[in-house]
Swiss-Prot record:
GO molecular function annotation: host cell surface receptor binding; structural molecule activity
Protein name per its UniProtKB record: Outer capsid protein P8
Gene Ontology biological process: fusion of virus membrane with host plasma membrane; symbiont entry into host cell
Gene source species: Rice dwarf virus (isolate Fujian) (RDV)
Source organism superkingdom: Viruses
Length: 421
């Protein structure tokens, strides 16, 4: 089946997003009469006999689901669908990066559709409220802008080898320092704190603070910057928070802003923490000091490498499917388990995925280092595994993910009414 022939039945794919959004439980309200005709056309081309789904939206759907599952698990029957030529035009055998957003369009006419196309994300369902999940694999849903909602800095703090965690540092900062100039960089709700603890006076002058990786992906708006000695409601030992009007001004600079930003004023500041170090010019000698940045923190999309590499931005990758496709597969998975077909179908999907990837390689072969550790219905994790194949061209990896996404969406639609005899 060429892409042109597939476009003749594209109403089915266009209806997928509306189907999975509007269908709930036993309700079936996603497809139109035109979609029924498209379904009939597609099943004819798939050599699947008529399921009679037009006259009854319930029982025939069960038959249709059963036949589709049988079809998808027989690689000799669906082999054409796994080849990259499935998406190729008769006259122009190429696939653009925005194939999904160009041909599988939500029928809800969400005004954000242009944003979806610009972000070039993979998910199709419109989101009622775009928001950031701090503990996800950083493949955002189609309408989730990574910098759309504030984030608490303490949720991003990440301990690494040789570094004490954020909360354990609370007890350490309570303890009087035993030496001069002990630097620290911590986070709490709405605030980032950095400074130097000391048991003796620290002279005025220039001091530099390295911005850790977890903070380098943040920007802050409307921030107050001031001296403090409080961390999570406890008192930091070895710092001086008091100041007088006669004190010389203390300023600091960040890599993304060449201006001297004031400390201890009513000024509201907005700046990015990405790019390197904070350089602070201490105006007056203090026995240690702590500078607080208090404001609304958000993630910088152009600085968060996790957003592009699909690695977790807060912790090791977790089992969170942020495409929501697993929600629509729940009923299907329950039926597979109930009838003892779960392992059989999983093996079939693993073979299907490997066949699909092989078809994109030249010469056809499984790429070196490819190993799936997640189940087939965890689409985001499989996408991350595919996109991590550095020895495969990035555009090819993208096409693999988009191709697998369409097939998974089809299973989400048809598998909902799967009831094996």
């Amino acid at each position: 089946m060429s892409r042109q022939m597939w476009l003749d039945t594209s109403a089915l794919l266009e209806a997928i997003s509306e189907y999975v959004v509007r269908c709930n439980g036993d309700t079936f309200s996603g497809l139109t009469t035109g979609d029924f005709n498209a379904l009939s056309n597609m099943f004819t081309q798939l050599s699947v006999s008529s399921a009679g789904y037009v006259s009854d939206p319930r029982v025939p759907l069960q038959t249709m689901s059963n036949m589709f599952v049988s079809f998808i698990t027989s690689t000799d029957r669906c082999g054409y669908m796994l080849g990259k030529t499935w998406f190729n035009s008769d006259t122009k055998p190429t696939v653009s990066d925005d194939f999904i957003t160009a041909y599988i369009k939500p029928r809800l006419q969400v005004p954000m559709s242009d944003t979806v196309r610009q972000l070039n994300n993979l998910s199709l369902q419109p989101s009622a409220k775009p928001k950031l999940y701090e503990r996800q694999n950083a493949i955002m849903k189609g309408l989730d802008i990574p910098y759309s909602e504030p984030i608490e800095p303490c949720k991003l703090f990440r301990s690494v080898a040789g570094q004490t965690g954020n909360i354990p540092l609370m007890g350490i900062l309570l303890t009087p320092p035993v030496a001069q100039q002990q630097p620290f960089f911590v986070a709490e709700r709405r605030r980032i704190l950095f400074g130097i603890r000391s048991n003796a006076a620290i002279p005025a002058g220039a001091y530099q603070f390295v911005v850790p990786a977890w903070a380098s992906v943040l920007s802050v708006t409307g921030a107050y910057v001031y001296f403090t000695n409080s961390f999570f409601g406890t008192t930091i030992a070895g710092v001086t928070a008091t100041a007088t009007a006669a004190d010389a001004a203390t300023t600091f600079t960040v890599p993304t802003d060449a201006n001297n930003l004031p400390v201890q004023t009513d000024s509201r500041l907005s700046f990015s923490l990405g790019g390197g170090n904070i350089n602070l010019e201490l105006g007056v000698a203090k026995t240690g000091f702590c500078v607080a940045i208090e404001g609304e923190f958000t993630i910088l999309a152009n600085r968060s490498q996790a957003y592009y590499t699909l690695n977790s931005i807060t912790q090791t990758p977790t089992s969170i499917d942020d495409f929501d496709v697993s929600d629509f597969l729940t009923t299907f998975l329950s039926q597979l388990r109930a009838c003892g077909q779960y392992e059989i179908f999983s093996d079939a999907m693993d073979q299907l995925t490997n066949n699909l990837i092989t078809n994109y390689m030249d010469p056809p072969a499984i790429p070196a280092g490819l190993a799936f550790t997640s189940p087939w219905f965890r689409f985001s994790e499989r996408a991350r595994t595919i996109l991590a194949l550095q020895n495969v061209d990035l555009n090819i990896r993208k096409l693999m993910v988009r191709h697998l996404w369409v097939i998974t969406s089809l299973i989400a639609v048809f598998g909902r009414y799967y009831r094996p005899n």
